[in-house]
Amino acid sequence: MSQGKIVQIIGAVVDVEFPRNEVPKVYHALKVDGTEITLEVQQQLGDGVVRTIALGSTDGLKRNLVATNTERAISVPVGAGTLGRIMDVLGRPIDEAGDVQASDHWEIHRGAPSYEDQSSSTELLETGIKVIDLMCPFAKGGKVGLFGGAGVGKTVNMMELINNIAKAHSGLSVFAGVGERTREGNDFYHEMKDSNVLDKVAMVYGQMNEPPGNRLRVALTGLTMAEYFRDEKDASGKGKDVLLFVDNIYRYTLAGTEVSALLGRMPSAVGYQPTLAEEMGVLQERITSTKSGSITSIQAVYVPADDLTDPSPATTFAHLDSTVTLSRNIASLGIYPAVDPLDSTSRQMDPLVIGHEHYDTAQRVQQTLQKYKELKDIIAILGMDELSEEDKQSVSRARKIERFFSQPFHVAEVFTGSPGKYVSLKDTIRGFKAICDGEYDHLPEQAFYMVGSIEEAVEKANKMSAKA
């Protein structure tokens, strides 16, 4: 193994000089002797000098320290030994429960599956969340993005999806915490532990307080672990169906921006790295389903300043099968989950895939909400009395639909005091179809707020009238 000397340190960027005939390749990992720090080669500057990014704090590093080339990319433990464990970007345990007992190690830089290995699925994944199941259904083996600005509920929605899908899902899950709050990572760990599914989850964290190198690579570490479960065939010759949760994909882009600036690249639009689309593609193209197994991925995407045209969320959109857009306006009405049904999309929204009843109900709900949106200006200026009877009916139904989209979450029980509700797709379609048909025109709109199925709304209305 060749050895070089550190010649320059600028923040997280470290330049190392090697003999000219032993220069490491790009993405090779270097170990700094006498420390725990790993460096990843990013550029070859010539004259034997390579520019690297430190995966860890560079505090205490100094010039002339020896760095050894491992002659391979960063490798992380994979397999059953990672389940129930919390690891960092290098696959080292951070849960104080001893070493990770892994039978194999895989490099985090890997190619995407070839076209002939990939497979697509139209099987629906029920989430138990009414607005998602009805308006932007998820596909098994698909990619889902939860888009939203600061504080509109991306992480809570993701936790509820984990609660509803990962617990009911007999397969394995991998959670990659990319540049988010350590507290949320801790909450997730305890949530999984309390519900006895910790032995089916591998957790990889590179949180907000970590250097940009860690935050840039931690998503790849989590993905590599998920790929192993997908590709490693069991006795029947099949891989597994894996759930991959990433919170938050925007921080991956942001870490890339920081690294890009440190490496001296010219910034592009809004200060992002010039390689934004390529970096996103490298990650997203690997999150796919093959003939042996599937990866269903749910990614939270922070939207800077609520601007969906910002280059980072705009680049992410192209890779997704379903987009769940969280709206600040809906959150301000107290309707949670604050999903915007007119702005959320799904490739599954096809009568041949989801069935005619589901498709027709979703379309009618959308039309009713769109009509209400158009009438809002008239109502604001002239008031409800100026509307025709037909328009008044549309507005009344739209307001009931809006409130019926709200739902108490299991993960928020501690804060709200009301027990969480899981609503099956069948009940969801039945409830919204009945509202659109006018079967519940006589009920007050408040009865539809924060309930599960339509029967609960009727029960709530009866209680309200009894009190009155």
From Swiss-Prot:
It is an enzyme of class 7 (translocase). Keywords: ATP synthesis, ATP-binding, Cell inner membrane, Cell membrane, CF(1), Hydrogen ion transport, Ion transport, Membrane, Nucleotide-binding, Translocase, Transport. GO terms for cellular component: plasma membrane; proton-transporting ATP synthase complex. PANTHER family: ATP SYNTHASE, ATP SYNTHASE SUBUNIT BETA, MITOCHONDRIAL. SUPFAM superfamilies: C-terminal domain of alpha and beta subunits of F1 ATP synthase, N-terminal domain of alpha and beta subunits of F1 ATP synthase, P-loop containing nucleoside triphosphate hydrolases. F-type ATPases have 2 components, CF(1) - the catalytic core - and CF(0) - the membrane proton channel. CF(1) has five subunits: alpha(3), beta(3), gamma(1), delta(1), epsilon(1). CF(0) has three main subunits: a(1), b(2) and c(9-12). The alpha and beta chains form an alternating ring which encloses part of the gamma chain. CF(1) is attached to CF(0) by a central stalk formed by the gamma and epsilon chains, while a peripheral stalk is formed by the delta and b chains. This is ATP synthase subunit beta. ATP binds at G148, G149, A150, G151, V152, G153, K154, T155. It catalyses: ATP + H2O + 4 H(+)(in) = ADP + phosphate + 5 H(+)(out). Transmembrane segments: none annotated. It is a peripheral membrane protein. Belongs to the ATPase alpha/beta chains family. GO terms for molecular function: ATP binding; ATP hydrolysis activity; proton-transporting ATP synthase activity, rotational mechanism. The keyword Translocase applies. InterPro entries: AAA+_ATPase (IPR003593), ATP-synt_VA_C (IPR055190), ATP_synth_F1_bsu (IPR005722), ATPase_a/bsu_AS (IPR020003), ATPase_alpha/beta_chains (IPR050053), ATPase_F1/V1/A1_a/bsu_N (IPR004100), ATPase_F1/V1/A1_a/bsu_N_sf (IPR036121), ATPase_F1/V1/A1_a/bsu_nucl-bd (IPR000194). It is found in: Cell inner membrane. Produces ATP from ADP in the presence of a proton gradient across the membrane. The catalytic sites are hosted primarily by the beta subunits. It comes from Xanthomonas axonopodis pv. citri (strain 306).
